């Protein structure tokens, strides 16, 4: 099992380099991803041990902020967020390896994107380790372009259908349900794919699906960036983007499993919260004008079948 974990780690670290290189190619000023490598000390007082590399870009003309973060950690006991739906795993040791990214563009017409790909192994050093994959990618637009959502979902469906034709409808629905702010009765965006506890096939079959899914992120996102990054926008557009970013913050801090897992397990706070947008605003009881571009967003982000 350790060999398989290392193989996935090698894939993720190479993917991290590929994604940051491609994103930098679309940046138009001197902003670059900086690498922040870290290691948790292997001491008795540390609940979580391991290492990682958080790659951050800030202040770009295209990407106002972005993070592509790799980590490999292990602990003596899975935190509550990881065992809430699988009580049989409570108290078990674990290894977790993953890559998580969030890209916050400067232009309000370019959507924010998020992706995550990970593996968990409980009882990794025993004769019967329990493994599962998780991940997916989702899109959060501020102003609607139907063709962008169709392209995003078509890319997701193509990858899923290559492996299992039941995956796309199942993981698309899961994504719509997961990225939902209960207290706002709003979806975070137009969704995409979300899956967890993936071990319904052999390890190699699941590995191949997850790596194909991860490799398709750039195919899904970069054409949208290229199409929208030069659209002129006003301060009104920017203000609405900042307001909607507030929803992103609310979701990450209240509902996101990765954030909760990281904080509960004693993870590296700077890396865990690096996905936060550089700026966000909240307005008391604000409502968009009837018939405005801003009002259309609230209809656009409701779950729907994007692929006719």
From Swiss-Prot:
SUPFAM superfamilies: Coproporphyrinogen III oxidase. Signal peptide: none annotated. It is an enzyme of class 1 (oxidoreductase). A divalent metal cation binds at residues 104, 114, 153, 183. Its EC number is 1.3.3.3. Its main location: cytoplasm. It comes from the Bacteria. Coiled coil: none annotated. The active site is at residue 114. It is found in: Cytoplasm. One of its GO terms (molecular function) is protein homodimerization activity. GO terms for biological process: protoporphyrinogen IX biosynthetic process. Involved in the heme biosynthesis. Catalyzes the aerobic oxidative decarboxylation of propionate groups of rings A and B of coproporphyrinogen-III to yield the vinyl groups in protoporphyrinogen-IX. HAMAP family: Coprogen_oxidas. Homodimer. This is Oxygen-dependent coproporphyrinogen-III oxidase. It comes from Francisella tularensis subsp. mediasiatica (strain FSC147). The lineage of its organism: Bacteria, Pseudomonadati, Pseudomonadota, Gammaproteobacteria, Thiotrichales. The gene is hemF.
